[in-house]
């Protein structure tokens, strides 16, 4: 699905990513871990060009989306993104949040009865997504009335509404109260079971062990280790990874 070749990113004279190479295949669950400031969130934001790479290639569905001549919005439709702070529109209801992108894309150029019919279909699909997370009774409320866990689950199904080829998660549980983390991770596990391709920046080591098929360790803008969860956590090779795990696995 995604082939990253020699990806580089600088902010001014500060090099944040120093030549990242990774292939993400269909159905992969890739968990990205690393210390604060290591470049892991920048790496994720470069994957859908929310941050413009300074160098390298990002081949997504056979197109180099890092090429400035490519219309990135066409490709972003196929790449969901879930943020740490939910990024729901507070002036729109839960249902409107989920319908917004599909209506914008699928109803473009439609008028009258055809548009009405398409909006009806999108509404039904959005309600089915809410039913999946047992939140159909929240369709007409505004995000400010929801708990953090509910907001994040809405944000995840909002990304599903576009039928993406891959979903990127940027620390999806780090802004949540501890008792709400489980409901979000359970939803992510169910997506993994269905074969959704996911790239996840997270501090949830238990989730990485249980759900990932690959874990990568980024530090100082480079991938220092990439392995199966079993190898990664039980037999780490890189000294910096060993040191990192000794601090986070208590």
Residue ranges and their predicted role:
Residues 1-229:
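ABC family nucleotide-binding domain
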Residues 219, 224-226, 230-250:
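C-terminal boundary and immediately downstream tail of ABC-type ATPase nucleotide-binding domains
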């Amino acid at each position: 699905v995604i082939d990253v070749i020699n990806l580089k990113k600088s902010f001014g004279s500060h090099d944040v990513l120093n030549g990242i190479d990774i292939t993400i295949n269909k159905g992969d669950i890739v968990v990205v871990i690393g210390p604060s400031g290591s470049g892991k969130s920048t790496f994720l934001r470069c994957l859908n060009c929310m941050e413009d790479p300074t160098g390298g290639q990002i081949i997504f569905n056979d197109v180099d989306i890092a090429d400035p001549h490519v219309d990135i919005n066409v490709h972003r439709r196929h790449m969901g993104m879930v943020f740490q702070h939910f990024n729901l529109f507070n002036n729109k209801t839960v249902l409107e949040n989920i319908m917004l992108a599909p209506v914008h894309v699928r109803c473009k150029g439609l008028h009258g009865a055809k548009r009405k019919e398409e909006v009806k279909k999108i509404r039904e699909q959005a309600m089915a997504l809410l039913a999946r997370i047992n939140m159909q009774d929240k369709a007409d409320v505004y995000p400010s009335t929801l708990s953090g866990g509910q907001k994040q689950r809405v944000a995840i199904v909002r990304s599903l509404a576009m039928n993406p080829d891959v979903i990127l998660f940027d620390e999806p549980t780090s802004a949540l109260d501890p008792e709400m983390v489980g409901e979000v991770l359970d939803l992510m596990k169910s997506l993994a079971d269905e074969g959704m391709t996911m790239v996840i920046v997270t501090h949830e080591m238990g989730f990485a062990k249980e759900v990932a098929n690959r874990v990568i360790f980024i530090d100082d803008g480079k991938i220092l280790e990439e392995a199966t969860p079993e190898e990664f956590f039980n037999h780490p090779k890189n000294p910096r990874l060993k040191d990192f795990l000794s601090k986070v696995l208590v």
